[in-house]
Amino acid sequence: MKIDELRTPCYVIDEGKLTENLLILNGVMQRTGARILLAQKAFSAFYEYPLIGRYLSGTTASGLFEARLAHEEMGKENHVFCPAFLPQEMDELVEICDHIVFNSVSQYLLHRDKIEKADKKISVGLRINPECSTQEGHEIYDPCAPGSRLGITREALDKAIKNGLDLSRIEGFHFHTLCEQDSDALETTLAAVEEKFGDLLYGLKWLNMGGGHHITRADYDIERLEKCIMHMRDKYDLEIYLEPGEAVALDAGYLETTVLDIVENNGIKILILDTSAACHMPDVLEMPYRPPLMDSGEPGEKKYTYRLSSCTCLAGDVLGDYS
């Protein structure tokens, strides 16, 4: 079937490019011994899970339903993190997950009994907050922003230890501080992790460096990434995990859409599409950013300039201006 024969709106996945990305990620795994997981919140096209599972170690989930999807469709390592878990969800999570990461000490203590009574061994981790911001321009995605709810600061962890927390049952630490960044930001973050939590790393089995690593981007510094991985692996005798999302599927697909109408207001020609930023590309509004459009230019660069918008009733549901 040709692209112009597809019913729209429609996501089209380029398996060739997806495989190229997976080969890059698998190369990092082979050279460093790190285990790389698919972050399903970024890409959950489960039809591709058998392909992804041939190259990566497993998946990470942001809740019960993603964890269930990974369990059913990939069947490899199944990690889950959520800022707070519902007690009734934990009953199923302990059956289908291998690693469960808690956002706070109180969450760990709340669910500890179910984990210890589970029929299988579950590796428990805590999400830490190294309080090291490396992002500029999109603070909405910065887990280290002042007052962040994500991760445990060293001050909070020390208080819990003083109050009797037994860290011997915690096998790993997890941090996720990056967003579409290069490995220099990881290097900066690791320096903060070592400064604040280094003394505790020696007693752990694994360290999960989270996502936000743009590993498959053409200009990404993979050599620096691998040095970071091997430094933490060798110094602290840790198994290292990474959980990229966008890097798995970067540039490996398209959103096909159809122009339904053209309206004009104040000299602006506006295309009404059968797609929506709010529904199909929420980051366009939340980040915000201007998604690339095939064969287009900046406004005014080419002969015709249009504003791309949607058929929803949200006035601000606009993708951007293109020529």
Predicted regions and their residues:
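Glycine-rich beta-strand-to-loop/alpha-helix junction loops that act as flexible
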Residues: 39, 177-178, 207-216, 244-246
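Charged helix-capping and loop-helix junction motifs
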Residues: 187-192, 221-227, 257, 323
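Generic N-terminal amphipathic, Lys/Arg-enriched alpha-helix
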Residues: 1-12
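Charged (often Lys/Glu-rich) extended helix/loop segments that serve as interaction or gating elements
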Residues: 228, 239, 244-323
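A short, N-terminal amphipathic alpha-helix
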Residues: 21-31, 69
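A non-catalytic, amphipathic alpha-helix used as a structural packing/dimerization or gating element
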Residues: 16-24, 192
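Active-site-proximal beta-alpha core segment in soluble small-molecule metabolic enzymes
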Residues: 34-206, 228-231, 272
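Short, glycine-/Ser/Thr-/acidic-enriched flexible segments
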Residues: 17, 43, 66, 107, ...
